[in-house]
A protein has these predicted regions:
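Jelly-roll (double-stranded beta-helix
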Residues: 1-413
Length: 413
């Protein structure tokens, strides 16, 4: 109804100390890191989504439009008569606790835990809470945009389908009076190079009656993801569970991949089914929306819903001791049977995987909710190597190979 340029000049606002827009002064570490859930603000500390953002790690800077930032959020207040415009990058919001009602210039989106939302750079929006508190994760990319991964040999069907991404229906607010403070002007918070600025305008920023185009916020219900998996043997790379990606100019690498580990059947035979111990060139920030991750036990002292972990490039990691021993005990029975099993319906873990090495924010590295004993989850790992059984397996494999060679020779003759 009125153009967004109709506002007073921006002036610097107080930027929370735990919100970062560049990471040159953050620290790097090859150690495995884990955090318990981000503490929620107390009732006497009203905190909205913007001021509840808590930067965990990142690479590059918003100023260079290069890299990314990983944040968590915990808030207990809706954004009333205000909005956020993020000039720094595109946001992927992953609610873990508490549904969000997101107002934008394009309309409304209901985003409960189990769904995710992408907010493009430069769109004005406000986050309202549908419960007393809310908590979750945010991936902010300074370069590129989220897109569906190239499915390659998978073909047309699988993973996240384009038809399941939902855009808001046009909705508008025709008012020139604040709901919370009649007579006051609306507040526009502008995030620019990691700093917050503020301007006032005499009308609601959500006064767009209709829109068209392909640059808009959207949400996705993670239960609609169609997982692919190994159906014979071995353990596929987690990239096979990619929902969205922000590719780099270098083929095979990404500014960030958003990967989920949803309920699914695990059927591989003669295989250690959980993610095995490994090192890789990517950096992995993991979160847990609900349930239990198959390679880490949940509960106090474990990987809790709302918690997070970080494993950097070439740092070894894998199942904790309890998960490892449980899988060894599950192995093929004495009769050779190796039945499938289904991961619980209430599980939903995810990963932000990135090619750029993350630097950890000082406040996150020294946080009281950081699990400094994380490394102890691998204490007690022991060898199950059986020399005699291994020798028999090698001999049996050699015999099978000799038999196949003999058949080929007969056919050739």
């Amino acid at each position: 109804m009125r153009p967004s340029v109709t506002h007073e000049p921006f002036s610097p606002s107080v930027t929370p100390e735990h919100l970062l827009g560049e990471f040159s002064r953050a620290s790097v570490t090859p150690n495995q890191l884990r955090w318990r859930p981000l503490p929620k603000p107390s009732a006497d500390q009203p905190t909205d989504f913007v001021h509840g953002l808590y930067s965990m790690c990142g690479a590059g800077s918003a100023a260079d439009k290069s890299g990314y930032a990983v944040h968590m959020y915990a808030c207990n207040q809706s954004m009333e008569d205000s909005c956020l415009c993020n000039a720094d990058g595109e946001l992927l919001v992953v609610p873990q606790e508490g549904a969000l009602r997101v107002k934008s210039e394009f309309g409304l989106l209901h985003v409960p835990p189990g769904s995710v939302m992408v907010m493009p750079r430069g769109v004005r929006f406000a986050v309202e809470l549908e419960s007393e508190t809310a908590r979750g994760y945010v991936l902010e990319v300074y370069s590129g945009r989220f897109e569906l991964p190239n499915l390659g040999p998978i073909g047309a069907n699988g993973l996240a389908a384009e038809r399941d991404f939902e855009a808001p229906v046009a909705w508008y607010e025709e008012t020139e009076e604040c709901h919370s403070a009649p007579g006051q002007s609306f507040r526009v918070v502008h995030k620019f190079e990691g700093m917050l600025f503020e301007a006032r305008q005499p009308f609601s920023p959500f006064n767009v009656v209709a829109w068209h185009g392909n640059y808009y916020p959207y949400r996705y219900d993670l239960s609609k993801f169609c997982p692919m998996n190994a159906v014979g043997f071995d353990h596929p790379d987690p990239s096979i569970f990619t929902v969205l990606t922000v590719p780099t100019e270098r083929p095979g690498t990404a500014v960030a991949d958003f990967v989920i580990f949803p309920p699914r059947w695990s059927v591989s035979e003669a295989t250690f089914r959980p993610p095995y111990y490994h090192r890789n060139c990517m950096n992995e920030f993991m979160g847990l929306i609900r349930g239990e991750y198959e390679a880490k036990k949940a509960g106090r002292g474990g990987f809790e819903p709302g918690g997070a972990s970080l494993h950097t490039c070439m740092t070894p990691h894998g199942p904790d001791t309890t998960s490892f021993e449980a899988e060894v005990a599950r192995g093929p029975g004495g009769d050779g049977s190796d039945p499938p099993h289904k991961l619980p319906l209430n599980t939903m873990a995810f990963m932000f995987e990135t090619y750029a090495t993350p630097r950890v924010a000082a406040h996150a590295a020294g946080a009281a909710h950081r699990d400094v004993d994380y490394y102890k989850c691998w204490t007690g790992l022991r060898s199950h190597f059986d020399r005699e059984a291994a020798a028999k397996a090698v001999a049996a494999a050699a015999a099978r190979d000799d038999g196949r060679k003999g058949k080929r020779q007969k056919v050739t003759a």
